[in-house]
């Protein structure tokens, strides 16, 4: 259970998760550039690589090689213990959609 919590403990790792959730299968170079451009995180490739190791060890990422390119894949199933723990906290239940915000036309 602690692996998932450790993995999301650092803001840079949360940014990597968010980035891969939005656009999966990115290279280390792509992630490094997007973390700078979208999250204002000026990390070196070596620093991003270290965060990726933590995410891989927690089961949140896998890596595959396509020719000479290594891409990173997000696996959010490893966050299930974190989601389960949060669900037990009072006030963290998902709220039903507000019917007044329905944008469909009848």
Task: Give the location of each predicted region.
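Short alpha-helix boundary/capping motifs
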Residues: 33, 44, 59-60, 83-84, ...
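Beta-hairpin "wing" of winged helix-turn-helix
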Residues: 56-67, 73
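N-terminal helix-turn-helix DNA-binding core of bacterial DNA-binding proteins
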Residues: 6-7, 11-44, 69-79
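Short, Lys/Arg-enriched N-terminal segment that forms or immediately precedes the first helix
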Residues: 1-5
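Hydrophobic small-molecule pocket/channel-lining residues, especially in calycin-type beta-barrels
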Residues: 32, 40, 59, 102-106
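Amphipathic alpha-helical dimerization/coiled-coil segments
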Residues: 18-22, 74-106
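Short, hydrophobic-biased segments on the C-terminal half of alpha helices
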Residues: 52-53
């Amino acid at each position: 259970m602690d692996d998932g919590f450790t993995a999301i403990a650092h803001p840079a790792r949360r940014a990597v998760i968010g980035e891969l959730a939005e656009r999966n299968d990115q290279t280390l170079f792509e992630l490094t550039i997007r973390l700078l451009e979208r999250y204002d995180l000026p990390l070196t490739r070596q620093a991003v690589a270290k965060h990726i190791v933590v995410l891989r060890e927690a089961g949140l990422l896998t890596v595959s090689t396509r020719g000479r390119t290594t891409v990173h894949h997000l696996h959010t199933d490893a966050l299930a213990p974190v989601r389960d723990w949060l669900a037990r906290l009072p006030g963290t239940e998902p709220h039903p959609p507000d019917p007044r915000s329905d944008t469909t036309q009848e």
